[in-house]
């Protein structure tokens, strides 16, 4: 569970190799000011397979997100053998069972004009007991979330499944998987994700 509101402005810094210096360099404060009136939202995963977004002030649900690679589990939530007097009950399918993490990142997003990098608020939702995978969403505008991609490691069939923001699904066999999608060692994602800036070919 995580509560996200307006981004805080960064403290100016001239000390290199710090987050504060990077934010100063990339004009983070302009992004913070542009989103200063953003509503406060509570994001929480549930064992019904859905990531829920609630208005933190009113408690009203804004939307729910079902990871596309886990949607096939939804029918198993109904169990007619339970609570037979009331025509059945429900099983926990977990789904988005991990703790979501949110961070403001300077990235080249699918929404970027001309491929330029920009500041976006990114939510990463691990599946926890729901499976060996995670989903990444853009929640810069809380009422209009954007699914960037989801990854799921299917250990039973020895495949890694990837779905993009264009709803394009790719499945890679363990023995022929591209290095950028080599999540063959990924297990159930119980730990909170760590989002960090690292060197990448000078980018």
Where are these regions (language model features)?
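A fold-level detector for beta-propeller and closely related beta-sheet-rich head/sensor domains
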Residues: 2-203
């Amino acid at each position: 569970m995580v509560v996200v509101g307006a981004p805080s402005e960064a403290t100016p810094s001239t000390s290199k190799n710090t987050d504060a210096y990077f934010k100063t360099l990339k004009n983070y404060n302009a992004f913070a000011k542009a989103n200063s009136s953003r509503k406060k939202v509570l994001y929480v995963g549930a064992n019904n397979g859905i990531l829920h977004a609630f208005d933190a002030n009113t408690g009203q649900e804004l939307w729910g997100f079902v990871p596309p690679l886990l949607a096939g589990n939804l029918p198993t939530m109904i169990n007619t053998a339970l609570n037979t007097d009331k025509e059945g009950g429900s099983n926990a399918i977990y789904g988005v069972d991990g703790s979501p993490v949110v961070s403001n990142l300077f990235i080249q997003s699918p929404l970027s004009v001309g491929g330029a990098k920009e500041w976006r608020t990114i939510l990463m939702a691990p599946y926890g007991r729901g499976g060996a995978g995670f989903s990444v969403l853009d929640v810069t505008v809380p009422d209009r979330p954007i699914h960037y991609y989801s990854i799921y490691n299917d250990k039973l069939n020895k495949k890694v499944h990837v779905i993009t923001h264009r709803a394009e699904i790719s499945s890679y066999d363990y023995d022929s998987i591209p290095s950028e999608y080599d999540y063959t060692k990924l297990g159930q994602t119980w730990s909170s994700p760590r989002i960090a800036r690292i060197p990448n070919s000078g980018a």
